[in-house]
């Protein structure tokens, strides 16, 4: 609480290319602070969905296309929980950056609406537009904005250098070819590592400038991916990882880097978690009052239900995994038995995370909840949440269906007095 925050959604990031020798800055950041051992990136592909989920603490409406995404819809919605808006209310200076053109996915609209003074490669950032562009150049062109402003500050970056295709026509792969040419990998894997080195160089420059400005010990750095690096074949990703990956679950294992510089010792968290959980966790850590009933993600450091959720509604918990594609339950060990009733409760719980999230964005629900001017959508019998003045830990889905605001078996029912179909769920 009170520290500066620099947050990254890193294009096609994978922790498997991190090493102390090749990427010392990423290695340090990923081994210092709060270590989330069982974090999974939710998405196979589509940057806008992964970025949306991280920024909103909600799942996107999966029926939408990339050009009509949930992020586009949210561009005119009331968004009180996004970090840009939430930290502005706490007196932070807030900045947002992307090293490609600003109207790609309409980030010039969506990111301003999240509370950021937003700059992109063609609007405020003096960098070369390439495919992909340089994360290092973006850092060099942006860091003075917030280091020269008053503290505290929050900066958000959507990176680009790690974008596929992974060959030597990729501008960043070609730039960093010499650094990887002797590595014992195939050409596509070397090209993947090469373009991702540009993120390492950007982070190295960031840390250098934080030290020079005297604020390194007051600045937290958080980083995760937007999606699995789908530009690599499964065989190439196995090669990068150095092991045969479980394609249903483990290929989604990723990093929620939460670098906190002045902890006396690292905090290790073994709860299962995924992309939507980052926002509520950071809101808690930075002392922002919020109502957890209105987010699909869960503060990973809180008590309650913890799971990693994937985009096809497969999920992982400490006791079992569920493959939604095959409707298969995989217990953590042979002594664990999952009843049909318990599985159904979990399955509906995950279904409703997606349903609630879609309805929130499609109806501009937060505007109704907080009595703000809405960009569109109408709801009857809504509840204004005026009873919560501090952080409140109750899973949003549990609140919604226990109080009749979601009918798990009727996807179109939201905001009215639906009859809950699911019994009590373990808190």
Predicted region positions:
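Extracytoplasmic Gram-positive cell-surface binding/anchoring modules and repeats
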Residues: 379-427
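Solvent-exposed soluble domains appended to multi-pass membrane proteins
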Residues: 1-379
């Amino acid at each position: 609480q009170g520290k500066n925050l620099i947050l990254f959604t890193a294009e096609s990031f994978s922790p498997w290319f991190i090493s102390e020798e090749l990427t010392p800055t990423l290695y340090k950041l990923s081994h210092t602070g709060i270590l989330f051992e069982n974090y999974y990136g939710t998405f196979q592909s589509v940057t806008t969905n992964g970025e949306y989920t991280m920024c909103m603490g909600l799942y996107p409406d999966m029926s939408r296309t990339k050009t009509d995404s949930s992020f586009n819809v949210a561009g005119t919605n009331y968004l009180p929980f996004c970090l840009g808006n939430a930290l502005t209310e706490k007196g932070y200076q807030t900045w947002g950056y992307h090293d490609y053109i600003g109207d790609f996915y309409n980030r010039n609209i969506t990111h301003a609406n999240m509370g950021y003074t937003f700059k992109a490669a063609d609007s405020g950032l003096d960098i070369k537009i390439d495919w992909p562009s340089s994360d290092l150049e973006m850092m060099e062109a942006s860091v003075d904005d917030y280091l020269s402003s008053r503290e505290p500050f929050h900066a958000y970056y959507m990176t680009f250098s790690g974008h596929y295709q992974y060959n030597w026509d990729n501008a960043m792969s070609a730039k960093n070819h010499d650094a990887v040419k002797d590595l014992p990998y195939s050409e596509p894997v070397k090209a993947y590592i090469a373009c991702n080195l540009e993120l390492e160089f950007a982070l190295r420059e960031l840390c250098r400038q934080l030290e020079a400005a005297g604020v390194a010990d007051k600045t937290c750095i958080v980083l995760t991916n937007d999606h699995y690096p789908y530009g690599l074949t499964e065989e190439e990703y196995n090669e990068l990882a150095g092991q045969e990956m479980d394609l249903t679950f483990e290929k989604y294992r990723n990093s929620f880097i939460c670098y906190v510089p002045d902890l006396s010792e690292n905090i290790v968290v073994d709860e299962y978690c995924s992309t939507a959980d980052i926002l509520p966790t950071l809101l808690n850590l930075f002392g922002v009052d919020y109502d957890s009933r209105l987010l699909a993600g869960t503060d990973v450091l809180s008590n309650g239900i913890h799971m990693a959720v994937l985009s096809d509604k497969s999920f992982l918990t400490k006791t079992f995994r569920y493959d939604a594609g095959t409707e298969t339950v995989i217990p953590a060990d042979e002594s664990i038995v999952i009843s049909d009733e318990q599985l159904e409760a979990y399955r509906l719980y995950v279904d409703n995370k997606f349903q609630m999230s879609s309805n929130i964005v499609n109806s501009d629900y937060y505007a109704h909840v907080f009595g703000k001017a809405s960009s569109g959508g109408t709801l009857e019998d809504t509840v204004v949440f005026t009873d919560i003045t501090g952080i409140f830990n109750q899973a949003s889905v549990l609140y919604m269906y226990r109080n009749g605001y979601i009918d798990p078996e009727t996807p179109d029912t939201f905001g009215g007095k639906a009859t809950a179909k699911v019994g009590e769920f373990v808190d």
